Amino acid sequence: TYYADETGARVEGEWIYTVEPSTAEDDADADYYYYYLLSSGKVASGKRNNIKGQTYLFDDQYRMLSGWVRGKVGSDGKTVYESIDDEDSSVVIESDSSENYTYYYCGGSDDGHVKKDKWIKTWRPADTYEEDEDVDQFWYWIESDGKIFVPSNSDADKVAAEKWKLEDGELVIKANYESVTKKKVNSKDYFFNENGEMLSEFLYVLEDSKDLKEGLYYFGGSDDGSMKTGAETIKDDNLDSFKFYFETKGENKGVGITGNKSNKLY
């Protein structure tokens, strides 16, 4: 497939914003999409790693994808990419070894390049279309290859945990997670649930694992998420302050203590 401009010349090495090939441009109801014409004049498809210095993903209709994107390796070994945040989306990000999905975030419809090596805060795919500010958004970590970090099913560091909250001066259980995973990002430790969402506030790990010990951990507020160590003053829902201490090193790093520490009781 090629594309000719209004003079009839074949377009090469450029973006075009137009309707699908089978649609008339004067169709008032037609949807417009971005396409990229390679130096050969052919329309780009799949994953393209160096379009003006950026990586872009295209679906099987050659359309540039934006927002949440999912890749799946087919029987021919090629990866097919698709948008997963449209109006009818019910997609849940998760690690599924039987499907071998990979997930990406490609910004807005006028942007489209794959984000890499950075944090993003956004809605889950099924909630993205509405962009409802009353619906929770979550932090996700994007690896240097553009893939959203989602803990694998084989991750040896996955453990069950409970989300605790400090209310009226007491720690109470608010939610249960079948599995959480510890990951180091930019020299700091973070915990993620099975959907790749960064966790925050208090978590109680219910069992020992290879690199995690049972106990209470604290990760700061919802826009922080890094595991805390040492002395911390934390406010409850009434804004009353309470002091905690979390181990600073060794196999118990991050675990809250109960008892005497440096002549102080916690």
Q: Which residues fall in each region the model found?
A:
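Extracellular adhesion/carbohydrate-binding repeat motifs centered on closely spaced tryptophans
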Residues: 1-266
